[in-house]
Amino acid sequence: MTEETHPDDDSYIVRVKAVVMTRDDSSGGWFPQEGGGISRVGVCKVMHPEGNGRSGFLIHGERQKDKLVVLECYVRKDLVYTKANPTFHHWKVDNRKFGLTFQSPADARAFDRGVRKAIEDLIEGSTTSSSTIHNEAELGDDDVFTTATDSSSNSSQKREQPTRTVSSPTSCEHRRIYTLGHLHDSYPTDHYHLDQPMPRPYRQVSFPDDDEEIVRINPREKIWMTGYEDYRHAPVRGKYPDPSEDVDSSYVRFAKGEVPKHDYNYPYVDSSDFGLGEDPKGRGGSVIKTQPSRGKSRRRKEDGERSRCVYCRDMFNHEENRRGHCQDAPDSVRTCIRRVSCMWCADSMLYHCMSDPEGDYTDPCSCDTSDEKFCLRWMALIALSFLAPCMCCYLPLRACYHCGVMCRCCGGKHKAAA
């Protein structure tokens, strides 16, 4: 690997743990690359080896145990990406085939989003060194606003467009910098002085809705996505600030204002309920001078009971965790139905007779009429059912299983990470 294409830790837009696979066309199967082993595979932004000043994206894989580089593949616009199953994806570039066996479906989905985002940026041409960020919808809570200055002299009436200045941050994990345009349209030029110190940036704090976590993978953001074990043994980040972060990126500005005065009309309550004595004038009640205590909000209560699932890596609430909520969790009822109905016979037949060159085939009981082998597949299943009559029980059992999932009697449950 040359020095120009060597990725650093900050250049990765997504990084997961997986086993790098290679395709053997002679046997028609996938085998572990260089003897197998868990590798750190990610999509990173690097400079093109041609040295034309343009940058691209590289899929880089490094085995953990010996730091051996087992995968290097540049992302191209004509890359063909195939999701064979939830934990195995493969792609093809220039008649070269690469594959990855992920540790969880969530890792596979994250890597797929990272590759698709890299291809989109290559198509849009936003990876050149002179490209600018023009989509304001991608700006988040860590945006840094810089004031544009007029570059014209005092005697010149010519105004130049504000230039975009992007500086690499040193302390925070990721930070996007952009310039507020058209600042010169409403103010005269003598209001801007180059010798004025720039105001200290403050972090804008927002509280997103906890019902759904939104994960955005942007190659311009230096987001580090860790592997499967890291999510199980590390606390969930993003909801509470990390005290280990640099002080410069952890300031919060609160607007100071006069505290509003509230007029409370309290009901008449017997003083005995509060342990107060009788009023000296003989009245049975007294004025309550204490403010009513604030109860814990429902959101804070739910936050304390939410955990991350080890199977699908989604956040769930312990009180609402019932059967059928996690599709990736193991389910003994579903496994028993497939074994009793001998569905392994149908899988074997479709794999050997109706699979594509990559070994992928359609679900045996799929009703998608757009499949070119729809009629042939069902005719083969009907013929196979004469040899294995127990296959006829699969559809009724599957219908009962779906009813059980709707009634929350069957299906997998979320399991909290340790």
From Swiss-Prot:
Which residues get modified to Phosphotyrosine?
A: 228, 231
The record, for CDD domains, names: EVH1_SPRED-like
Fill in the subunit field for this protein: Homodimer and heterodimer. Able to interact with SPRED1 to form heterodimers. Interacts with RAS. May interact with ZDHHC13 (via ANK repeats) and ZDHHC17 (via ANK repeats). Interacts with TESK1. Interacts with NF1.
To which species is this protein native?
Pongo abelii (Sumatran orangutan)
SPR domain spans which residues? Answer: 308-416
The record's keywords, sorted A to Z, are: Cell membrane, Cytoplasm, Cytoplasmic vesicle, Membrane, Phosphoprotein, Ubl conjugation
One Gene Ontology biological process: negative regulation of lens fiber cell differentiation
Any one cellular component term from GO for this entry?
A: transport vesicle membrane
- The protein's name is Sprouty-related, EVH1 domain-containing protein 2
UniProt topology in membrane: Peripheral membrane protein
| Gene (UniProt) | SPRED2
UniProt subcellular location: Cell membrane; Cytoplasmic vesicle, Secretory vesicle membrane; Cytoplasm
Domain named KBD is located at 201-257
Q: Which residues carry this modification: Phosphoserine?
A: 206
Residue stretches of biased makeup (Polar residues):
146-156
**What are the WH1 domain coordinates in residue numbering?**
5-122
Q: Where are the transmembrane segments?
A: none
Lineage of the organism? Eukaryota, Metazoa, Chordata, Craniata, Vertebrata
